[in-house]
Amino acid sequence: MEFVFLGTGAGVPSKGRNVSAIALQLLEERGQTWLFDCGEATQHQILHTSVRPRRIEKIFITHLHGDHIFGLPGLLGSRSFQGGTTPLTVYGPKGIKQFIEVALSVSTTHVKYPLEIVEITEEGTVFEDNEFHVETKRLSHGIECFGYRIIEKDIQGALLVDKLLEMGVKPGPLFKRLKDGEVVELENGTILNGQDFIGPPQKGRIITILGDTRFCEASRELAQDADVLVHEATFAAEDEQQAYDYFHSTSKQAASIALQANAKRLILTHISSRYQGDTYKELLKEARELFSNTEIATDLKSFPVER
């Protein structure tokens, strides 16, 4: 599991930061990539990374401001032109379906893969399978905006190979049957229960990716006990009133959410273009005063998510 930040700016692109898009690489977990927001020129940013459009399985949109969705039509079309045939699902607030369908229709873009568009109308679970559970809550951004909590389900423990070897069980088909929890009988008549040879489960990770938002309780709830919290930091602490007026957060407010939620790690993004060059490091300094395990994203930077 790895984050690749494709765009980390706020509102409009700047020389150093494109607008919002985050790839969550789930290559080891499911051989796929999930995308969170898709601002203008996201597909250009992808060209400079290891992200492959054909592997994008799901796109989660936080809200319908242009800096979060204007890259969608081009990316959806290019995925088809590049030979993508596997299904893709887009999740987002009401209106995302109309935006995509009109853009594709007017441009006569025909995608050659199954495209499903799911409009989120209420809080709660938006996706679940045997590996992941994704839930959402409304944030405070003036228009409907959602934050996402991605919960990886616990992973079965490893087969205790050394224990089996000590008992004289040789590697082979029996190992798989025991790994699957079956009860097997050895040639000498010994009965083995697979459950006795499985180590403790690996706890799944929790990832929280928030859209644009003021400081609010929903952010804390989504981030509770998260292994990684990705939070916007459009403004410095001294501009807290301006952040409130424009439905955004400061770096220190993001750190406060991480602290209150008992998150393990905080990554700041959605940085205003007013912070050019190294001036953005002041945002990082402010956040670390409150929550030490804070990092700040820059375009094309990757962040592995360890277990």
From Swiss-Prot:
Gene3D superfamilies linked:
Ribonuclease Z/Hydroxyacylglutathione hydrolase-like
Catalytic residues as annotated in Swiss-Prot or TrEMBL: D67 (proton acceptor)
Cofactors per UniProt? Zn(2+)
Family, similarity comment:
Belongs to the RNase Z family.
Instruction: Cite the EC number.
Output: 3.1.26.11
Q: How is the cofactor bound?
A: Binds 2 Zn(2+) ions.
Query: Gene encoding this chain?
Result: rnz
**Catalyzed reactions per annotation:** Endonucleolytic cleavage of RNA, removing extra 3' nucleotides from tRNA precursor, generating 3' termini of tRNAs. A 3'-hydroxy group is left at the tRNA terminus and a 5'-phosphoryl group is left at the trailer molecule
Describe its function.
Zinc phosphodiesterase, which displays some tRNA 3'-processing endonuclease activity. Probably involved in tRNA maturation, by removing a 3'-trailer from precursor tRNA.
Name under which the protein is recorded: Ribonuclease Z
Q: Organism, per UniProt?
A: Bacillus cereus (strain AH187)
